[in-house]
UniProtKB/Swiss-Prot annotation:
This is Elongation factor G 2. It holds the Pfam family GTP_EFTU_D2. The gene is fusA2. The lineage of its organism: Bacteria, Pseudomonadati, Pseudomonadota, Gammaproteobacteria, Alteromonadales. Its main location: cytoplasm. GO terms for biological process: ribosome disassembly.
Length: 697
C-alpha cells in the first residue's frame, strides 16, 4: 500500500481542444502506464474510450486512471471540456484533492475554461496551471498568464519561462533551479538536456524568479523577514511555502509546454508531487443527517477509522456494471459487507478493480485516499454513501442541475420498447443529468438533458451500444409557468352520498414567491377552524398540482400559498377532504393570479474573430439575446450574452458559417425569465396543436 502522503487525486480540466486529453496521455506515457501514445485526432486516446469520444475528438465521460511518478500514486481523472457534460466535471471535483487547469497557448482562457475554473473554485480544489500548445502559431505564454488574472481573477505563480515560441519552442527555464530544460525534435520525452539559461533570457529569468520567491516567502512570516534582510531561503523552504500557498488557493503554480511534442511534461508531474495536496491535507468531507443538513461531523481521511466512501459514478461497460468509489476513511476488502446509508441495505463487495481507462487490474483491498471501481453492485446510485454497517453515516449529497432540453423518442421496431427501457435505465444510473419520463397524454418517452450535444450523444449510445434504433422528435424547451398577482380566495369541497361525507373549506391567499423558491406553504390560521392536523393535507394537495400549470401545462414555479382560515366538520372532515379542497383551490385561483409563461435563459459565451464580431453580435440580437460583455483579445473577441434557449438550437452551425469555422461558444443555464407575449402565444398554440394531433392517433 502507498503511504497516504504520497497519494495525489487529480483532475485535468480545460476547454474543448486545449489539449487536456493529450496531456493525460503524456502523463500515462511518462509514468509507464502506456507504451504507445494514442492521439485524440486519430481517435486512439486511452481515456477517450467511448466510440462517440473517439469519433468526435471530445471527452464525454470522466475516465479514471491510476499511475505512479517518483514513488507517488496518481489517480488521474480526465474530465470533459464541453459544457453539455459539465456534470462529469462537477462530480469529479467532488472526489478530487487537486487539479491541473490546461489552457491553450494561443486560444488562452476560452469559454468552458472559465466555467470549469469557477466550479473548481466553488469546490476549493487546489490547482496547477499548464499552458499547453506553445508550439502553435500565435502562442504567447505571458499573455495567457495575464488572461488568467484578468478573466479568472486567478493569481498565477510563474514557475517556468518558455525558450522559443511557436515552431521554435524547444524547452523551458526552471526559475527555481535557474536551469534550462531543452528537448530535441524527436518527440520523445526522455530526449532532453539540462543546460544553463540562454544568455538573452538571464535578465527576464531573474526578474520572474524574484517575483516567485517574494510570493512564496509571504506564506511564512519568519522567512519573509529573513528575505527582507537579504537572506535567500533554501530550496526546501521555498517549495514548502509554494505548497502552502497552493493548498490555500493563494496562488496557482504555472507551467508551460507542448503535450503533443512531449516538452515540459516532467516538470508538470514534479509539480503535482511537490505542490498539490495529499488526501489528508484537504478539508475533510462533512457528514449530514437524513435531511441532508450538516451534523458537525466529518469523514477524516484515515485508514484506521470506520469505512466512509462515496459512489460518485456508475458505468455499464463490456465488463459489467462498475461503481466508481472514493474512499475517505477506513479500508475496504474483497468480500466485505458494506452499508448503503441511502437505501439502508447492505451489500457484499465482490470484485474490486483499479481502472486504467477501459482496462482494469483486480485488487484485494483499498484504503482511505483510493479511487477504485467495484464490480457488480446492484442497488447503488451516484451520490450514495457506502459505510461500515456498525458505524452508519451519510456524506454530503451530490446535487445535479435540472435538464433544460427534451426530445420525444420511440423505437423504430415495434418490439423495441422493452429493450429501450432497459438501456435507458442503465444510462440514467450512469448520468444523473440525463432524465426520462413518460408523457401522460401521449404515452411518449421523453428524454431530458443539458443540451443538444448531450441528447445527441445519448441517442447515439442507444443505437450503437444497445442496438436500439430510434425515431427522434424535435428538441423541446423546458418552459415553466408562474403567477404575477396576489389572489385572496376561498374553496369548499363538499360531498354527500349517503353515509359519511367529505367536507373541507379553506380560505387562502396565493402570491408570487421569491425566485427559485418553488412552492412555499404558510399558515396564519388562528383558532381551530382548520385543525393543525389537516394543514399538511392542504400543503400536499396544492403542491401536487404545481406540476401542471394552467397556461400550457408546464410545471409552475415560485408560488407562495398562505392558509388564512376555513371550516371543518367534526364527522365529515378528513385529510383527504382538505387535500381535494386544496387541489380545487389551485384550479380555481391560479388562472386568476395572472399566470405567465417562463423560458430558460442561457448564459452564452462566444469567441469570434475580429472580422466577424459585428455579424455575431447582430445574430445574437436577432435571437433575442442581451449582450452583457465584450473583451478584445489578441486573436479575437469574447462576447458574453444572455439568450433564450429556444433561440439557440442549431447555433453552432450558424456560428461556424459566419466565422468560417473559427468561432467557438459555450452556454449554460442561467435563470428563467418571462416570455414575451408573442413567444408565449406561439408556445401555447404549439402545445394545443401537438395535443390535438396526439388525440387523433
Amino acid at each position: 500500500m502507498t503511504e497516504l502522503s504520497k497519494y495525489r487525486n487529480i483532475g485535468i480540466f480545460a476547454h474543448v481542444d486545449a489539449g487536456k486529453t493529450t496531456t493525460t496521455e503524456r502523463i500515462l506515457k511518462l509514468t509507464g502506464k502506456i507504451h504507445k501514445i494514442g492521439e485524440v485526432h486519430d481517435g486512439e486516446s486511452t481515456t477517450d474510450f467511448m466510440v462517440q469520444e473517439a469519433e468526435r475528438g471530445i471527452t464525454i465521460q470522466s475516465a479514471a486512471v491510476s499511475c505512479f511518478w517518483n514513488d507517488h500514486r496518481f489517480n488521474v481523472i480526465d474530465t470533459p471540456g464541453h459544457v453539455d457534460f459539465t456534470v462529469e466535471v462537477y462530480r469529479s471535483l467532488k472526489v478530487l484533492d487537486g487539479g491541473v487547469g490546461v489552457f491553450c497557448g494561443s486560444g488562452g482562457v476560452e469559454p468552458q475554461s472559465e466555467t470549469n475554473w469557477r466550479y473548481a473554485n466553488d469546490s476549493e480544489v487546489a490547482r496547477i496551471i499548464f499552458v499547453n500548445k506553445l508550439d502553435r502559431m500565435g502562442a504567447d505564454f505571458l499573455r495567457v498568464v495575464k488572461q488568467t488574472k484578468d478573466v479568472l481573477a486567478a493569481n498565477p505563480l510563474v514557475m517556468v519561462l518558455p525558450i522559443g515560441i511557436e515552431d521554435e519552442f524547444c524547452g523551458v527555464v526552471d526559475l527555481l533551479t535557474r536551469k534550462a530544460h531543452i528537448w530535441d525534435d524527436s518527440g520523445l520525452p526522455e530526449n532532453f538536456e539540462i543546460k544553463d539559461v540562454p544568455a538573452d533570457m538571464v535578465d527576464l529569468v531573474e526578474e520572474y524568479r524574484e517575483m516567485l520567491i517574494e510570493a512564496a516567502v509571504e506564506q511564512d512570516d519568519d522567512l519573509l523577514e529573513s528575505y527582507m534582510e537579504g537572506v535567500e531561503p533554501s530550496m526546501e523552504d521555498i517549495k514548502r511555502c509554494i505548497r502552502k500557498g497552493t493548498r490555500t488557493l493563494t496562488f496557482f503554480p504555472t507551467y508551460c509546454g507542448s503535450a503533443f511534442k512531449n516538452k515540459g511534461m516532467q516538470l508538470l508531474l514534479d509539480a503535482v508531487v511537490d505542490y498539490l495536496p495529499a488526501p489528508d491535507e484537504v478539508d475533510p468531507q462533512p457528514l449530514t443527517d437524513e435531511e441532508g443538513v450538516e451534523n458537525g461531523e466529518f469523514a477524516i481521511v484515515d485508514a484506521d477509522l470506520p469505512l466512509k466512501a462515496l459512489a460518485f459514478k456508475i458505468m455499464d461497460d463490456r465488463f459489467g456494471a462498475l461503481t466508481f468509489v472514493r474512499i475517505y476513511s477506513g479500508r475496504l476488502k474483497k468480500g466485505d459487507t458494506i452499508l448503503n446509508s441511502f437505501t439502508g441495505k447492505s451489500e457484499r463487495v465482490g470484485r474490486m478493480v483499479e481502472m486504467y481507462a477501459d482496462d482494469r487490474i483486480e485488487i484485494e483491498s483499498a484504503q482511505a485516499g483510493d479511487i477504485i471501481a467495484i464490480v457488480g453492485m446492484k442497488n447503488v446510485q451516484t451520490g450514495h454513501t457506502l459505510c461500515d454497517p456498525k458505524h452508519p453515516c451519510t456524506l454530503e449529497a451530490m446535487v445535479f442541475p435540472e435538464p433544460v432540453i427534451s426530445i420525444a423518442v420511440a423505437p423504430k421496431d415495434k418490439g423495441g420498447s422493452e429493450k429501450m427501457g432497459i438501456a435507458i435505465g442503465k444510462m440514467i444510473a450512469e448520468d444523473p443529468s440525463f432524465r426520462v419520463e413518460t408523457d401522460e397524454d401521449s404515452g411518449e418517452t421523453i428524454l431530458k438533458g443539458m443540451g443538444e450535444l448531450h441528447l445527441d450523444i445519448k441517442v447515439d449510445i442507444l443505437k450503437r451500444t444497445y442496438g436500439v434504433e430510434l425515431i427522434v422528435g424535435e428538441p423541446q424547451v423546458a418552459y415553466r409557468e408562474t403567477i404575477t398577482a396576489e389572489v385572496e380566495d376561498s374553496y369548499t369541497h363538499k360531498k354527500q352520498s349517503g353515509g359519511s361525507g367529505q367536507f373541507g373549506k379553506i380560505d387562502y391567499k396565493i402570491r408570487p414567491g421569491e425566485a427559485n423558491t418553488g412552492f412555499v406553504f404558510k399558515s396564519s390560521v388562528v383558532g381551530g377552524n382548520v385543525p393543525k392536523e389537516f394543514w399538511p393535507a392542504v400543503q400536499k394537495g396544492f403542491g401536487s398540482m404545481m406540476n401542471t400549470g394552467t397556461i400550457a401545462g408546464f410545471p409552475v414555479l415560485d408560488v407562495e400559498f398562505e392558509l388564512t382560515d376555513g371550516a371543518f366538520h367534526a364527522v365529515d372532515s378528513s385529510a383527504i377532504a382538505f387535500e381535494i379542497a386544496a387541489k380545487g383551490a389551485f384550479r380555481q385561483s391560479i388562472a386568476k393570479a395572472k399566470p405567465q409563461l417562463l423560458e430558460p435563459i442561457m448564459k452564452v459565451d462566444v469567441f469570434s474573430p475580429d472580422d466577424n464580431v459585428g455579424d455575431v453580435i447582430g445574430d445574437l440580437n436577432r435571437r433575442r439575446g442581451m449582450i452583457k460583455d465584450q473583451n478584445a483579445g489578441v486573436t479575437g473577441v469574447r462576447i458574453k450574452a444572455d439568450v433564450p434557449l429556444s433561440e439557440m438550437f442549431g447555433y453552432i452551425g450558424t456560428l461556424r458559417t459566419m466565422t468560417s469555422g473559427r468561432g467557438q461558444f459555450s452556454m449554460e443555464f442561467a435563470h428563467y425569465a418571462a416570455c414575451p407575449n408573442s413567444v408565449s402565444e406561439k408556445v401555447v398554440t404549439q402545445v394545443k396543436e401537438r395535443k390535438a394531433a396526439e388525440a387523433k392517433k
